[in-house]
């Protein structure tokens, strides 16, 4: 039986999901889990279809914040569900608010930063804007470019097929179930498709207001980070992405690893997916799930991702992924990329942290500076992590957490990362940093190295030592040499 892991000591039984596969092989596959063949056409086909029901933006008003002009627009991104879906919705017309901040010194033709945000436009008490909006005026003033925030991606709460009103993961999980059960009739039923169209339509609305804007950087958190990925992979106006807490890729391998890490239990964050039987599909697979992943899983877009600059922000105490999840997909990603893991941070990252990460990335990207280059190695014999870089480092810190009882480093577990300085050995302009975990410590250790430069902060992906699951089976963690930067 599968189970949902509620916290460090409590679990509840859930639906049966078969036998998990415990061997985590290097690069891209796990025993019996060959990656799904790519299907890059489904998203593009949906975007083409949805555009027919898109409506132009309407200016709602204009204000000034410390010299920055902020315009508010409303627009309709699409009608969903439509053709290619048997879903029924109580609110098929997707409506949005778009905030656009324009600094006085903005240069014509400069790129636009678009942050995809949430909120609830169908809440019982009326529309509710995102609880923690991005400080777009402050970012626009500091960067000298237009910065926008898209509200209501997805539209919610929604009643799908007469079900009780749902939002966020409840909507995604139900829409996935439909898509998996009828891969052809419901090929456009995944909620991520209209979310992606919402971002694409927002770029159209921005260009209608700023005809000289031709390039975009997209960002968003969690499923909106997923949206940033899919929009960036399918719309060439997007030149860079900054996805936040979107540690999902190589989905079957990644989340089988999550399941085994928690002693063959699912974290409570995945409860909606467990209720809809999707966790069982992760472990056992099915033609319908494979068809879904062909266009949902970004590892299936190697050519498209190579042109995107990627700064991926993750949480060391994430509620969905485990700290070393990234090793299941990072070797499969192409093109320029850097990482930043936030210590002692859950899946729910505040707008101030997001804004600071965006400020650093955009400042460097606008200046034409490549992302810091580094080589990262993990030694599977003793857990040693080694980093070589020529990027000037102002401060280097090791973040180390120990759990004597469980392979669990979620913030909710009570385990905290401790900071300690780490010195590099430098020769001919290249510095090497190393850390080896103490094998005498009981339980498990999670660790990563953070590098703070003059204008940019980046980290290694975390490792966990020792290489075993709670049931004693080995975890030959795929830690091949990673080349970051570019």
Question: What spans do the regions from the language model cover?
Answer:
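Serine-hydrolase catalytic core
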Residues: 287-343, 389-394
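Short beta-strand element of the alpha/beta-hydrolase
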Residues: 109-119
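N-terminal cap/lid segment of alpha/beta-hydrolase-fold proteins
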Residues: 50-106, 150
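Gly/Ser-rich "nucleophile elbow"/oxyanion-hole loop immediately N-terminal to the catalytic nucleophile
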Residues: 181-197, 201-222
